[in-house]
Structure formats: structure tokens, C-alpha cells
Amino acid sequence: MENIKKYYENTKDTLPNPMVKKFINMNIKPQNAIDLGCGAGRDTIYLIKNGWKVLSIDKENTKELISSKLDSKEIKKFRFNVQNFEDIKLEKNNLLVANFSIPFCSKDYFNEFWNKINDSILKDRILCWKLFWIK
């Protein structure tokens, strides 16, 4: 638990993932997004500041950390759920962001988890994700 708190503290002011920035630059009309494994909220905050309504999901409660970066108008576009991937419930969305989070799903549950992701994304919409790699 101490390591995860340190991670959130170290990443709370990090710039959004470059893929999310690139997505925003495509000038797609802001709609509903899910930030799956949102951590300290860098992508959530960026999406909201660019007009998106975001449901952020993480196994740790980082709601207050993220909320502190949003003004009163932006906070209305923010929702937060504490959920493990094995118990996840995903609502329909136009964009699902899952940067560095998918590998944390139990391999025994992965197929069901992936189907939930696939079923949640509305037709002709976008999944933005990044996995780990070795340099």
C-alpha cells in the first residue's frame, strides 16, 4: 500500500499520456470516456479539461487527488468508481483509455475482462491503451 501511495504522489503532476494528447488533437467531439486504471488521473484530468465526461476507475481511491485538480465546472464531468478488474462493470462509452492497466488483470479472468471492454465501447469508437515493454 505504501508503494502505491508513493507512486500516486510521484505521478500526480505528470503530463497526460502522449497517445491521449494525440487523440485530443484529432478534434473528435467530446463525449463519454472511461479511464480504466486511472491512477493519479493524468489522462482523466486532460480529457475533462478538453470537454470529455469521464468515469475514472481504479482499485485505489484516488478520487480526492483527481478532484483537487478540477474546477467547479469540470468536477461535474467527473465520476469515480473503486473497482477491481475481476469485478468490473463498464458502462457504454465512446472512448476507453487503459494505459498501463490491462496487464494488472488476473490471467484467469482476462478473457471475460476483455469481453467487457469490447462490449462497453460503442460502435466506431476508440480504445486507447498502452502495455508495458522492455527497452
Give the label of every model feature segment.
Residues 100-101:
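Short catalytic micro-motifs in class I SAM-dependent methyltransferases
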Residues 97:
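A conserved beta-strand element that flanks and buttresses the S-adenosyl-L-methionine
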Residues 1-30, 34, 39-89, 112, ...:
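Class I (Rossmann-like) S-adenosyl-L-methionine-dependent methyltransferase catalytic domain
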Residues 111-123:
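A short glycine-rich, Lys/Arg-flanked "PGG" loop and its adjoining helix->strand segment in the class I
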